[in-house]
């Protein structure tokens, strides 16, 4: 993916009116502190995303996919991140492109906001119940992208959000954040409850991993780099 530096203060309308190129129209990153701003535009989607890892859990999300908006709001609330997302995609063909591209942007934002990862806890895990559903999430800010997903719903959907979109989102996020992510559904129940537990578990695990260890000053690896 080609990234170019430019001002983050570009409206989604301005991007939509720009002249398209064959694939990626534009993408830009700005990362003051533990914040990141991503603008990504293709023929299929236009995504603007702002992330503050040291936020208060505030979310302002509009992707055109209501259930997905709710899940991203849960990530912000349970991770204590501030998250703003604006996405416009080819929803007439389904939500796949929009969900995947938001995952790409959130992963890229995480990678940029974390910088060289000095002083971080690095690892995080959570076991989250949602009534009858139970989900385990474990992650490592390893610099090595890997995603594993076991036991999740298959062939179900709610409000146009299909079960297959859950792994698609997290795979895109893990690849672009360069993190190792394991999601295991230990007890599957109602589709909404199961997916909600997955997103909450991810948020809780990530909140732990990106926390700063006051006793650590270097990169949390004997290699000296992640």
Each model region followed by its residue ranges:
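Structural preference for solvent-exposed beta-strand-turn elements
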Residues: 12, 16-226
């Amino acid at each position: 993916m080609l990234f170019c530096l430019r001002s983050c203060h570009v409206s989604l309308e301005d991007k939509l009116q720009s002249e398209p190129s064959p694939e990626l129209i534009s993408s830009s990153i700005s990362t003051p502190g533990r914040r990141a701003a991503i603008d990504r535009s293709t023929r299929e989607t236009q995504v603007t995303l702002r992330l503050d890892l040291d936020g208060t859990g505030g979310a302002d999300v509009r992707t055109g996919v209501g259930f997905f908006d709710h899940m991203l709001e849960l990530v912000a609330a349970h991770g204590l991140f501030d998250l703003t997302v604006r996405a416009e995609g080819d929803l007439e063909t389904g939500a796949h492109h929009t969900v995947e591209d938001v995952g790409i942007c959130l992963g890229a934002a995480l990678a940029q906001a974390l910088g060289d990862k000095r002083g971080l806890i690095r690892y995080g895990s959570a076991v989250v119940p949602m009534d009858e559903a139970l989900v385990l999430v474990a992650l490592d800010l390893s610099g090595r992208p890997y995603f594993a997903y076991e036991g999740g719903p298959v062939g179900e959907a709610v409000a146009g959000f299909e079960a297959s979109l859950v792994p698609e989102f997290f795979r895109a996020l893990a690849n672009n954040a360069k993190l190792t992510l394991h999601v295991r559904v230990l007890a599957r129940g109602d589709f909404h409850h199961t997916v909600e537990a997955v997103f909450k578990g991810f948020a809780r695990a990530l909140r732990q991993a990106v926390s700063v260890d006051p006793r650590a000053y270097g990169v949390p690896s004997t290699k000296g780099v992640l």
